[in-house]
Amino acid sequence: TARVLAANGITACMYPRLEPTPALSWAVRYLGCGAGVCVTASHNPAKYNGYKVYGADGCQITLEAAEKILAAIEKIDCFDDVRLADFDAAAAAGRIVTIDEKCLDDFVQAVYDQRVGDGAGIDALKLVYTPLNGTGLECVKKLLKKLGVTHVTVVPEQEKPDGDFPTCPYPNPEIREAMQKGLELCDKVRPDLLLGTDPDCDRCGTAVPDGKG
C-alpha cells in the first residue's frame, strides 16, 4: 500500500513495527494525514485479512465513502494500471516516512489519561495477558506499566505476532475458545484477572476467578 501511494505522489507514513489499529487512528489525526489504511483480519480468521480505511478525522470511513473508493477501483485494471514504487527509493525521496516513536508514546499517554479512579491498590493486581498473536503486546504492556501493574504474565504461545493465528483460529477475545490458552495459564498462575486483546487490539475480553476453581 505504501509503495502504491508513493508511486502516485502521496506521502505514506508508516509505523516501524506492527501496531494496534487504534494507534493508526491516532496517527492520522496526530500527523494531520488525509486518510489512514490498516491491513488486518481483526478478530476474524486469517483468511479474512482485509483493508480498513480511515478518514482524516481518524474514524472509519462511511459506506458512502467506501462506495466511491470501490467505484474508482473498478475503473482500473489491477494488473496493468497499478503503479508501484521501489520502497527504498521512495523512502529516500521522502515519499515513505517512518513514524517517530513520540507518536506512539503520546498515544499511550492519551489512553492513560482516560483512566477512571485513582488506581488505589492496582499495584497488587496479578494479571495474565494475551495479545492472541496480534499487535497488542507493546502498547498494552506500556499502558499497564504506567498504571502501576507490574505482575503481568503473558501467554507464551500467543505473545508474538503471527498472522496465521496458529493457537487460535478465531481470535475474538469475547469468545471463550479464543481465551483457552489464557485460561489454562490462569489455572497455574492464579491471577486476579485475565485480559485478552484481538489481533489488531481494538477489542478486548476479560475473565475473573469465580471462586469455584
Cite the ranges covered by each PLM segment.
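N-terminal small/polar loop signature for handling phosphorylated ligands or for N-terminal nucleophile
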Residues: 1-48, 146-206
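Short, intrinsically disordered, charge-balanced linker/junction segments flanking boundaries
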Residues: 15, 210-213
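Gly/Ser/Thr-enriched, mixed-charge loops and adjacent short helices
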Residues: 49-185
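Residue-level signal for short segments within beta-strands and strand-turn junctions
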Residues: 55, 208-210
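Short, function-defining helix-loop hinge/capping sites that tune catalysis or transport
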Residues: 138, 206-208
